[in-house]
Amino acid sequence: MFYTLILENQSGEQVNLSTTANQYKTSKIEGLNPPAGTISTSSYAGMNGSYLNNAFIEKRNVVISFAMRGIGIEKRRHQLYHVVKPSRYIKIWYKTANIDVYAEGYVETCEVSNFEQQISGQISILCPDIYWYSRDIFYAYYSGVIGAFHFPFPESNAPFPLGVYSNSNLFSITNDGDETGFTLRIEALPSDIPQEIVAVTPTIYNENGEYLQIKGDILTGDVITVTTKTGNKTVTLTRNGVDSNILNRLVSGSTWLTLKEGTNIFRVEAVRGVKKLRVTLMHRNSYLGV
């Protein structure tokens, strides 16, 4: 199988472990499969079977075994040490004919045998975030006004639309990976009146009736960014160029919505002004195994 394997540090410096046999020859990559699950059970007193206490997935451990070939091995070994440093952040880029993903973690070890006839090495990377993420970002949009202007520009004197009002409060997006969180951006459409209250208490519903509701006014120029990813759940308001945490405006009963596998349909509502909102949903496909 043809593949590309690149390690990138926090400064953006990279080392390609799949260049040619005269550079690196990767012999084995562990950690591409889904990580093992940890399942805790307790036995029933005097009864067959047991009951489940909890089940979860541990961190991912990516272990790369390789050999170094050709000339200039010592120089390349020091280049490797420069990029892959123990305890430091590292991004793993992995690409095949059908998938292009990355995982993020921290280097546990980077060992190279210096005094053997066949120079070999092994890199161990621990990834607290267990998923592989697609390189591409996928978007879905809702807007109360849909742009209708297009080229070529009409040459007649007849009126033509610059935009049309949307009759639907629905938008959809397809998730080709595993269930995952996403980033939601809610912003007010432009207005001629500074600091005008454009909308009040926007709510996003999924197909199951679960919702995420943010109480309060949205003014001209406001941008609300919601992140629903596990381990990074935030609600941020950007007003006049200043970011502030508005997690306290999340209404009780709200759900941190996620993207299920396949097609997901969402509905946008508000106490008033829903047609004056623009909503953008962004996500990367996430995979437990590649």
Task: Outline where the language-model segments fall.
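Compositionally biased, low-complexity regions
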Residues: 56-57, 61-91, 98
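Intrinsically disordered, low-complexity segments enriched in serine, threonine, and glycine
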Residues: 140-290
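Polar/acidic, low-complexity leader/linker segments enriched in S/T/G and N/D
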Residues: 1-41
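Short beta-strand and beta-hairpin "edge-sheet" elements
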Residues: 89, 93-136
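Oligomerization/assembly interface segments of phage tail-like spikes and tubes
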Residues: 47-71, 117-130, 264
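"Short basic amphipathic alpha-helical interaction patches in structured regions
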Residues: 75-84, 120-122, 137-142
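Short amphipathic beta-strand/extended segments with alternating polar/hydrophobic composition
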Residues: 14-23, 101-108, 211-218, 245-252
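Residues at beta-strand starts and edge strands
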Residues: 1, 58-62, 101, 117-121, ...
